[in-house]
C-alpha cells in the first residue's frame, strides 16, 4: 500500500494533472522583527510556549500559543474572493482554521497587513457565525463566511474563511504573514469551519489526497505541493509513519538518543509534525537533558544559547521514528544569526507531547497523506 501511494503520487506529478505547487519564501521571523523594535524582551516575559489545546466551550474558542509562530519563516501567497484579493499566509499543519484580516478589524496588527473587503467580492457569503482563537494573552475575534480561495492553479469555491475583527496586542503587527491557513485534520477546526485541504479533497481538486513540504535551508526553492510527491526534493526512500490521532499530524517517536544513549522520550512519546512551529518542542525535563548534553546554556529569557565556535564538536541528536533513525546535526538544530547561536530545542512545562517544527522539516522532506493517514519522511536534498 505504501509503495502504491508513492507510485500514484509520483505518477500524478509526471502527468502534471491537477498538481499544485505553491512556492514558499523565507521571510523575517517575528522574533527578529520584535528584537529590532526592542519588543522581544517584554514579549518573552509575557508569553508561554505550548501546544494548541482542543477546541472547547461556547463559541468554539481555540487556544494557540502565540510563540508557536515566533520563529516561523516560510510563507506563501493565496487569493480570496472575486475578483481575487492577495494575501500572504502561513501554511500551518498544526492548526485547521483559515483566516485573514478584514476591513472590520481596527487593531494595529490588521492595519499593518492586507485586509479582506467582503463588499468587493461577488462570491462572499456571510455565515453569521463567530470565530475566536486565543493567542497567548489575547485572542483573534472574527466572523465566518464562505468565499472562493485560489491557491496556485486551484480555484476552491464555497470555502469557509475566518475574517478577523480583532487581533491580539501588537505582536501580529510585525509578522510578515497576513493570515493562517491550517492544514491539520477537520477535528481540530472550529465549528462550522471546513479546512481548505478537506474542501479541495471533497471537490476532487487534487490528484491525490496528500500534500508534501520541502523547506530549503537557505530559503530559496522551498515548496508546498498539493496532490503529489516530488522525488526531486529528497534522496533515498520515503519511510512511512502511521498517524496515531487524526487531529494533528501526530505519530509515535520511539526515542531520542545522543551517542547511542537515550536522553529523551524513553519508552516512546507522541509528536506532531508542524510547519507552523519553527523549533523542536518537548517536555521541559526531556529538553533540559538535551540542552545539557549539547552544551547549551540558559539565558535570562529562558532560551538556550550555544557557543558558535563549538558547533563542529557538538553531538548529533537522533530521533527514532517507527524503527528508522533521523539524525539532526548541530548545524541543523542550531540557529545562527549575527554571530549568535541558539538551540533549536524548546521546553514546554504543561505537555507531554512533542512538536517537530521547521528545524526537523528542513532536514526531512515531509508527506502528509490524508487518504491513508500516514506521514512520509525522507532526507531532504
Curated annotation (Swiss-Prot):
InterPro entries: Aspartic_peptidase_A1, Aspartic_peptidase_AS, Aspartic_peptidase_N, Pepsin_A, PEPTIDASE_A1, Peptidase_aspartic_dom_sf
CDD domains: pepsin_A
GO biological process: digestion; proteolysis
Disulfide bonds: 105-110, 265-269, 308-341
Assembly information from the UniProt record: Monomer.
Similarity annotation: Belongs to the peptidase A1 family.
Protein's recorded name: Chymosin
Organism in which the protein naturally occurs: Ovis aries
Amino acid at each position: 500500500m505504501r509503495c502504491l501511494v508513492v507510485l500514484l503520487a509520483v505518477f500524478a506529478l509526471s502527468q502534471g494533472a491537477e498538481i499544485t505547487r505553491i512556492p514558499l519564501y523565507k521571510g523575517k521571523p517575528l522574533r527578529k522583527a520584535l528584537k529590532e523594535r526592542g519588543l522581544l524582551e517584554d514579549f518573552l516575559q509575557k508569553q508561554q510556549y505550548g501546544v494548541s489545546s482542543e477546541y472547547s466551550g461556547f463559541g468554539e474558542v481555540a487556544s494557540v500559543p502565540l510563540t508557536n509562530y515566533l520563529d516561523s519563516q516560510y510563507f506563501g501567497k493565496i487569493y480570496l474572493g472575486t475578483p481575487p484579493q492577495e494575501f500572504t499566509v502561513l501554511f500551518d499543519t498544526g492548526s485547521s482554521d483559515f483566516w485573514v484580516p478584514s476591513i472590520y478589524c481596527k487593531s494595529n496588527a490588521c492595519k499593518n497587513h492586507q485586509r479582506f473587503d467582503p463588499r468587493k467580492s461577488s462570491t462572499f457569503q456571510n455565515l453569521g457565525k463567530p470565530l475566536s482563537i486565543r493567542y497567548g494573552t489575547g485572542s483573534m475575534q472574527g466572523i465566518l463566511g464562505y468565499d472562493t480561495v485560489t491557491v496556485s492553479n486551484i480555484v476552491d469555491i464555497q470555502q469557509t474563511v475566518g475574517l478577523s475583527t480583532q487581533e491580539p496586542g501588537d505582536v501580529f503587527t510585525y509578522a510578515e504573514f497576513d493570515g493562517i491557513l491550517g492544514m491539520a485534520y477537520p477535528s481540530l477546526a472550529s465549528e462550522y469551519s471546513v479546512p481548505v485541504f478537506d474542501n479541495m479533497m471533497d471537490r476532487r481538486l487534487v490528484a491525490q489526497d496528500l500534500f508534501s513540504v520541502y523547506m530549503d535551508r537557505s530559503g530559496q526553492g522551498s515548496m508546498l505541493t498539493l496532490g503529489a510527491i516530488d522525488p526531486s526534493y529528497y534522496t533515498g526512500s520515503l519511510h512511512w509513519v502511521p498517524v496515531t490521532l487524526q487531529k494533528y499530524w501526530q505519530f509515535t517517536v520511539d526515542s531520542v538518543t545522543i551517542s547511542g544513549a537515550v536522553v529523551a522520550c524513553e519508552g516512546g512519546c507522541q509528536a506532531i509534525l508542524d510547519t507552523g512551529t519553527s523549533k523542536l518542542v518537548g517536555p521541559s525535563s526531556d529538553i533540559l537533558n538535551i540542552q545539557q548534553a549539547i552544551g547549551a546554556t540558559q539565558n535570562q529569557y529562558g532560551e538556550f544559547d550555544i557557543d558558535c565556535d563549538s558547533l563542529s564538536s557538538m553531538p548529533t541528536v537522533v530521533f527514532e521514528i517507527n524503527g528508522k533513525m533521523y539524525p539532526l546535526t548541530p548545524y541543523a538544530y542550531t540557529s545562527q544569526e549575527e554571530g549568535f547561536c541558539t538551540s533549536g530545542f524548546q521546553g514546554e512545562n504543561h505537555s507531554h507531547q512533542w512538536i517537530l517544527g521547521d528545524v526537523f522539516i528542513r532536514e526531512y522532506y515531509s508527506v502528509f497523506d490524508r487518504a491513508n493517514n500516514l506521514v512520509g519522511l525522507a532526507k531532504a536534498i
